């Protein structure tokens, strides 16, 4: 246990998961150390680009977002979990918090298809993430594009 207050996590995560909620497709949580808790830094819609805009170079953050994946035969909602430790973090002790806290956060945010750890915005490339989601997704009908 990390000793961090995660009470503000479940509600916004439920908003991202809710199919009827068209206003919230992502949430970004910031790690606060005085007192130790996660707080909502940003939430909204707009996909990966808005998630990236909310990530801070000198912060520890967690992001959770909804995306659509699939092929012409089947489109499915997928969820991505990102742990972020910006390259601008100067205190090694703060970076160490990530390894302790990440497991606790994943106990609350436990519905995701892929998990990424990033330290630079260059680590978060839409096409690469889509490929990872597709690989993790199971069925792929793209090989059969003609009907029998």
Swiss-Prot record:
PROSITE patterns, sorted:
ADF_H
Tell me the GO molecular function terms.
actin filament binding
Instruction: Supply the InterPro entries for this chain.
Output: ADF-H (IPR002108), ADF-H/Gelsolin-like_dom_sf (IPR029006)
Topology relative to the membrane: Peripheral membrane protein
Q: Where is this motif: F-loop?
A: 71-76
Q: Give GO cellular component annotations, separated by semicolons.
A: cortical actin cytoskeleton; cytoplasm; extrinsic component of cytoplasmic side of plasma membrane; phagocytic cup; pseudopodium; site of polarized growth
What is known about its processing and modification? Phosphorylation at Ser-147 appears not to affect its binding to actin; however, it may regulate phagocytosis and motility.
How does this polypeptide assemble, per the annotation? Interacts with 14-3-3 protein 3.
According to UniProt, the name of this protein is Coactosin
Species in which this protein is naturally found: Entamoeba histolytica (strain ATCC 30459 / HM-1:IMSS / ABRM)
Classification from the root reads: Eukaryota, Amoebozoa, Evosea, Archamoebae, Mastigamoebida
């Amino acid at each position: 246990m990390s000793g961090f207050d995660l009470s503000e996590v479940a509600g916004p995560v439920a908003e991202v998961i809710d199919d009827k909620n068209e206003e919230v497709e992502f949430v970004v949580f910031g790690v606060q150390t005085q007192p130790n808790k996660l707080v909502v830094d940003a939430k909204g819609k707009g996909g990966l680009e808005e998630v990236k805009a909310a990530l801070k170079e000198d912060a520890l953050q967690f992001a959770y977002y909804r995306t659509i994946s699939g092929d012409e035969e089947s489109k499915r909602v997928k969820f991505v979990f990102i742990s972020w430790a910006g390259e601008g973090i100067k205190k090694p002790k703060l970076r160490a918090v990530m390894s302790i806290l990440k497991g606790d956060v994943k106990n609350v945010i436990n519905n995701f298809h892929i998990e990424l750890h990033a330290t630079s915005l260059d680590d978060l490339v839409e096409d690469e993430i889509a490929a990872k989601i597709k690989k993790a997704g199971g069925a792929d009908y793209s090989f059969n594009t003609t009907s029998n």
